[in-house]
Swiss-Prot record:
Protein name in the entry: tRNA(Met) cytidine acetyltransferase TmcA
HAMAP family membership: tRNA_acetyltr_TmcA
Organism encoding this protein: Vibrio cholerae serotype O1 (strain ATCC 39315 / El Tor Inaba N16961)
Function: Catalyzes the formation of N(4)-acetylcytidine (ac(4)C) at the wobble position of tRNA(Met), by using acetyl-CoA as an acetyl donor and ATP (or GTP).
UniProt GO cellular component terms: cytoplasm
Domain (N-acetyltransferase): residue spans on this chain: 398-574
Gene: tmcA
InterPro entries in alphabetical order: Acyl_CoA_acyltransferase, GNAT_dom, NAT10/TcmA_helicase, P-loop_NTPase, TmcA/NAT10/Kre33, TmcA_C_sf, TmcA_N, tRNA_acetyltr_TmcA
Catalytic activity: cytidine(34) in elongator tRNA(Met) + acetyl-CoA + ATP + H2O = N(4)-acetylcytidine(34) in elongator tRNA(Met) + ADP + phosphate + CoA + H(+)
GO biological process: rRNA acetylation involved in maturation of SSU-rRNA; tRNA acetylation; tRNA wobble cytosine modification
Location (main, coarse): cytoplasm
Amino acid sequence: MFPPSYDAFQGVTAIGWACANMAHHFGISLVMTQPITYLLQLQQLAKQGQTRFGCWLRGDAQWQHHLLKTLVPHFAEQPILMLGQTELEGVTCVDYRQGQQWLGRECQLLIVDLTQGWDANSFNAVLGTLVGGGLLLVVGEPTTLNHCARVWLERACHRLLVITPQTVPALPNSDSVTRTNTEQTYTEQRLAIDSIIKVVTGHRKRPLVLTADRGRGKTSALGLAAAELMSSRSMHIVVTAPTLAAVEPLFVHAQRTLPQAHRQRGEVQTAQSSLRFMAPDELLRTQPESDLLLVDEAAALPLPFLKRWVERYHRAVFSSTIHGYEGCGRGFSLKFQSWLQVQRPQMRSLHLEQPIRWAAGDALEQWQNQVFLLQSELPEVALEQAREPLSFSLFSQPECVEQPERLAQVFALLVNAHYQTSPNDLFALLQDEAMTLFVAYQGEVCVGCVLAVREGELDAPTIEAIQLGTRRPKGHLTPVTLANQLGISQAARQSCWRILRIAVHPDCQRQGIGSQLLTHFIAQHHADYYATSFGVSEDLLPFWLANHFVPIKLGSHRDQASGCYSLLMVRGEHLDWLEQAKQQFSAHWIFELSDSLQALEPQIIQQLLPSTVALPQPLIPLELIERYARGGANYESVAVWLYAWLLATAPSLESLSPLLISKILQRKSWAACAEQFQLSGKRQVEQAVRTEILALLVNLQCKYTLPI
């Protein structure tokens, strides 16, 4: 950084002299006026270029407080936010963990107190509220973090402009700060708004894919376009995203444009139109009528969801952050857009590059991208690298801190593979000593990684408290679940490694790298057993089954963001309690199929059935079942025997048809089955059921010579 030219700062120099004169008049020490003068000059420079600057105020608490107290009145007409519950007159203070509640708002001065604690998600959310011409002031030291996480954050803060009671840095070079054309800033956003409106006014089946980096006004454009449509016609618009908080700016901008509208949480209504949020799982389940579907942060949602919505809604916009934790770089383009171009050849796409809230080349945005690895891209895997042998190794926390380029590669894999990776995950990886990171390399390219956490080895009083429901120790999901929900205390006493994430480079998948990673990880990380918990899908489950993990607990509710049921699986040898866990799992999940798991996909049920332990069954009248299959009896008279028979034979069946799963095991209505399998009504559904039962009977007779 170099000091600015004299001409560029005649204005800010005048401010400096004014502050010095004021200090002399009121008896304020020059030790204080030097930082104040500097910060006011810095703000003028920021305003000149609509950019943002960050400063780290390093000094004792009394100096910091006095400096802020003196500075705040200069920002009296502008919104000021402080992250950290320190009382400061004229400043809105929020808990350091609650920055997300400021999504959709703006501030000109953002103060962050590190002594209160550190939450990376909260910090990243609130940093987006700081507009061009604004300043970030970091105060205090990150004393609540352990060594590696603290070193990472301190190094990040040292890359800001560091101010002490004795010294201030040179002002940034004015040549790097150029004035922004406000009209040009909004040109791209206007184009985005018009493109969204065109989805409604143009031909059907021409979805729009809208992509952007953070801060480009993508979500705001969705809200502004929705408001224009609602004001010009009767419109019912549905919005979905991983969380309601992610689309809060959409509703804020829609209401600002529609001052007469009534707004409540996740909804804006006018006399003739509505804009409402629906969680992804609810939207998938209920499939409401809608004139326009807006899917924000689409890259963070499961691909099967997006495909279903494309088929169901013929006027839809899919928007996504390409860099940052909300998106997944080119993975979104590879997975979804390529599929969409085949299914909807008339689709359109638009990428926003111009920032809205700050100027291009913003200093603070570049800093944020570096610190939180927001622009980490998956590296290309060259053909010659793909031929190199795999090497496996531990990537320790100190190595992560000292080798940020390698860490960025690994983290790009994690972000690409998992829809819920967040800034806090980066700091958990650096902070939590129970976590470990295990990586696979081909040459210089990281092609796979395992992130795992050590669990278990709990003492008897803790286990008893867990089983009574009075304690739930953080970071012990598997032993807590086994002790509390399955009543297996022995598992909580034993040691466990739980796999939090496993990721393989998209160019290297289907080559067995994931299985090799697991094998090498288990060989180098001893424990009594290993576990994993994930949103179960027909794509993921076969991988874990093939690697000798067995299911022991299936959640009863879908995750709102992923839309999947959570499945806990374990792997271990000579575990006295494993057979008991398998029997409990079999009884529980089969029982829940007709209740809380009625919406579980038949394909997943097919994959789980072979893991089901055969339970003692009553005498089954096969003759009655055969007569029904051939057209006799009625369904109600044999339903109980069909259910018992399928459960008794399921472990030996290679594949049970989705129709029999839905009607007999999940006990769905005739109407629901007709809709699901596109049949005309009960008669056609029942005929299909009879046909499939007869085929199953014949198949089993051939295999086991059953007397039917």
